[in-house]
Regions:
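A residue-level detector for the "anchor" residue at the start of short, highly conserved motifs
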Residues: 1-189
Length: 189
């Protein structure tokens, strides 16, 4: 845990960092929301939620079970997407070394907004997954087993039709290892 010093007139920020190879960490936010932060991830949030929103910043992967507060939307900001919820359970994967940002909804509803020059908003329903590729600016929505995909909180890995490169990156992150393989050979697998 690291508490970042900020000027007195602004909120104090808290940084939760989980290194590569470490178990996921469970934290509770000032509003009572529950968050699981995965390996090689950083979550930054204020020590109190002042103002009109509850805004957090994520680089990596985290699972959110949001306390309902219709007057203060809960917003997770990543490099390429903003994900907004009022009271719901969802997962966000947004590693800086991956071109994809993925939002997966378990319960409730979330609004996903791209940060393109022409922003795009999508409302997800349970078991829908929004995938945004920052290199191609492509968007897709898939139907998934959202509960299974968030089993990383319990240390389990689940892959279904995942590209080989994603499988390798996930294992490297979880176990803090480097896997050497012919990337060109497995590029489209």
């Amino acid at each position: 845990w690291l508490i970042l010093d900020t000027p007195q007139d602004t909120e104090q920020l808290i940084e939760c960092f989980v290194p590569k190879g470490e178990k996921a960490k469970q934290i509770f936010l000032p509003d009572g929301s529950e968050v699981w932060v995965n390996a090689e991830s950083i979550l930054i949030y204020p020590n109190t939620f002042k103002g009109d929103t509850r805004t957090l910043f994520l680089n990596g992967e985290a699972n959110f079970k949001v306390s309902r507060d219709k007057k203060k939307p809960f917003i997770v900001k990543t490099a390429t997407l903003d994900i907004e919820a009022l009271g719901t359970t969802f997962n966000v994967e947004s590693y800086s070394n991956s071109p994809q940002t993925i939002a997966t909804l378990e319960e409730g509803k979330i609004k996903v907004s791209t940060k393109d020059s022409i922003p795009h908003e999508t409302i997800l329903s349970p078991n829908e997954q929004f995938i945004y590729d920052r290199d191609t600016h492509s968007r897709e929505i898939n139907i998934v087993d959202a509960q299974r995909l968030s089993n990383w909180k319990e240390g389990q890995l689940y892959f279904k039709n995942a590209p080989f490169g994603k499988l390798v990156k996930t294992i490297e992150r979880k176990y803090n290892v480097t896997i050497l393989y012919d990337q060109e050979k497995y590029k489209n697998n």
